[in-house]
Amino acid sequence: MQLRLSSGNVLNEKVHKVGIIALGSFLENHGAVLPIDTDIKIASYIALKASILTGAKFLGVVIPSTEYEYVKHGIHNKPEEVYSYMRFLINEGKKIGVEKFLIVNCHGGNILVESFLKDLEYEFDIKVEMINITFTHASTEEVSVGYIIGIAKADEETLKEHNNFEKYPEVGMVGLKEARENNKAIDKEAKVVKRFGVKLDKKLGEKILNNAIEKVVEKIKEMIR
Amino acid sequence: MQLRLSSGNVLNEKVHKVGIIALGSFLENHGAVLPIDTDIKIASYIALKASILTGAKFLGVVIPSTEYEYVKHGIHNKPEEVYSYMRFLINEGKKIGVEKFLIVNCHGGNILVESFLKDLEYEFDIKVEMINITFTHASTEEVSVGYIIGIAKADEETLKEHNNFEKYPEVGMVGLKEARENNKAIDKEAKVVKRFGVKLDKKLGEKILNNAIEKVVEKIKEMIR
C-alpha cells in the first residue's frame, strides 16, 4: 500500500517519521484557579497543535509523571515508571514508521527522566529529544496560559482565593517549606510570588503559548533537516 | 495527599473519574487535500477539546487501528491489536483514578472493536463507551472539518486534484471497487460523491466540529450524572 506522504498540510514527506508525545502530570494541586491535570493538558495542547501545524504524528500522552522527593504537592510516580511508559509508546510508534520522538514536557519534576533518553535511543535505535516548557508553579505564567487554553477558573474571587498561600501552599511553592529549603531556585521563585502575588495576564498567556508552540514547531523542522 | 478536585474549569469533582481516549487511524490515504493521519488528528482534537471544556482526563490516543478486509486504502491492524492497546490505556488510566472511559472514534473501520468493549468492562470493572464521529471518506465533510482543524491543504488546485477519482480512488471510495461491491452503504455514498464531487465548506466544517465536541461533552456530563 503506497501511502500519500505529501498529502495534506505537512512540511514534507519526512515529517511522518516524527512522533510527538505530551508529558506532564495528572494528579498535582495547582491552587484554586487551575485543575490538578494542568501540566498534561498544557503539554497535550502544545503537542497536538504543533503536530497539526507540521504534519508530525501526535502519539498521545505519558500517563505517569515523576517529581523531586522534597516537592510534595501531588501524587507522582518513580522515574522508572515514566521511562517504562515511554518505552511502550516508542515501541508502538516505531510500528507506524516513527524514527524520531519529541517529548513535550510541561512538568518540572519530569526533568528527572532526561537521563533515560539515551537508553531509549540505544535500545530502539531511534532519536529522542525532550523540550521542557515549565513555569513557576501555578503562578502568573501558568495561570495565564491555562486561561488561554481553557482550563482555568479565573474569576476575581477565585484568583483572590488562589493568592491565599496559607490555604494553597503549592502556589508559587510559597508554602512548600521542604522544597524551598532543598532547592534555591524554588526558594527564589517563591519569594517573587509571595511579594507580587499571582495575576491573570491574557496577553502574556497568549504570548507564552504561541512561543511554546513555535519552539516545538522549530524543533520538528530541525529534526527533519 | 488531598487533591483539589474542584479547582479549575471542571464540571464537578466526579469528572476526574472520566478518561477520554482518541481513536482513529495513522496510515490511511485521504486523497490530496488531507494527510494520512487525518482520522486520529480529528479524534485527538475533539477528545482534547472536550477534556478541556469539562475537566475530564485526556489519556491520549490508541495507535493501532483496524478496517474491514474489503476496504483497501491504508495500513491497518487486526481488531485484537486495537483491543490490546485499549487494555494498556485502561490499566494505566485506572492507576490515576479513572473509572469511566470514553473513546472518541473517527475512523469507520474501528467499529469492528465495539464487540470488545464489554470484555474491557468486565475485565477491569470499569465503564467504557465509544462515540463514533465518522464521515464519508475524504469527502466534503471530512475535508471541511480537516480545514477548520488545520490539517488540510485546501487550495483550489489541490482540491481539483483531490476530485480526480482515477488518481485518488479512496476519495468517497469512488474507485474502491471491492469495498463498493461488499458494502451497500459505501456504494451509496460513492455514487453521491461521484455525482457532486468534493468541496470545501468552511461553515459546514465548523458546524460539524462544534456539534461533535458538544456531543462528547454531553456524553461526559451523562457519564457523571
From Swiss-Prot, chains A, B:
<dbReference type="Pfam" id="PF02633">
    <property type="entry name" value="Creatininase"/>
</dbReference>
<feature type="binding site">
    <location>
        <position position="39"/>
    </location>
    <ligand>
        <name>Fe cation 2</name>
    </ligand>
</feature>
<dbReference type="GO" id="GO:0016811">
    <property type="term" value="F:hydrolase activity, acting on carbon-nitrogen (but not peptide) bonds, in linear amides"/>
</dbReference>
<dbReference type="GO" id="GO:0008198">
    <property type="term" value="F:ferrous iron binding"/>
</dbReference>
<keyword id="KW-0378">Hydrolase</keyword>
<dbReference type="GO" id="GO:0052645">
    <property type="term" value="P:F420-0 metabolic process"/>
</dbReference>
<keyword id="KW-0408">Iron</keyword>
<feature type="binding site">
    <location>
        <position position="107"/>
    </location>
    <ligand>
        <name>Fe cation 1</name>
    </ligand>
</feature>
<dbReference type="InterPro" id="IPR003785">
    <property type="entry name" value="Creatininase/forma_Hydrolase"/>
</dbReference>
<protein>
    <recommendedName>
        <fullName>2-amino-5-formylamino-6-ribosylaminopyrimidin-4(3H)-one 5'-monophosphate deformylase</fullName>
        <ecNumber>3.5.1.102</ecNumber>
    </recommendedName>
</protein>
<dbReference type="GO" id="GO:0043729">
    <property type="term" value="F:2-amino-5-formylamino-6-(5-phosphoribosylamino)pyrimidin-4(3H)-one formate-lyase activity"/>
</dbReference>
<dbReference type="GO" id="GO:0042803">
    <property type="term" value="F:protein homodimerization activity"/>
</dbReference>
<keyword id="KW-0862">Zinc</keyword>
<dbReference type="GO" id="GO:0009231">
    <property type="term" value="P:riboflavin biosynthetic process"/>
</dbReference>
<comment type="similarity">
    <text>Belongs to the creatininase superfamily. FAPy deformylase family.</text>
</comment>
<feature type="binding site">
    <location>
        <position position="39"/>
    </location>
    <ligand>
        <name>Fe cation 1</name>
    </ligand>
</feature>
<comment type="function">
    <text>Catalyzes the hydrolysis of the formamide of 2-amino-5-formylamino-6-ribosylamino-4(3H)-pyrimidinone 5'-monophosphate (FAPy) to form 2,5-diamino-6-ribosylamino-4(3H)-pyrimidinone 5'-phosphate (APy).</text>
</comment>
<comment type="pathway">
    <text>Cofactor biosynthesis; coenzyme F420 biosynthesis.</text>
</comment>
<dbReference type="InterPro" id="IPR024901">
    <property type="entry name" value="FAPy_deformylase"/>
</dbReference>
<dbReference type="InterPro" id="IPR024087">
    <property type="entry name" value="Creatininase-like_sf"/>
</dbReference>
<comment type="pathway">
    <text>Cofactor biosynthesis; riboflavin biosynthesis.</text>
</comment>
<feature type="binding site">
    <location>
        <position position="28"/>
    </location>
    <ligand>
        <name>Fe cation 1</name>
    </ligand>
</feature>
<comment type="subunit">
    <text>Homodimer.</text>
</comment>
<feature type="binding site">
    <location>
        <position position="30"/>
    </location>
    <ligand>
        <name>Fe cation 2</name>
    </ligand>
</feature>
<keyword id="KW-0479">Metal-binding</keyword>
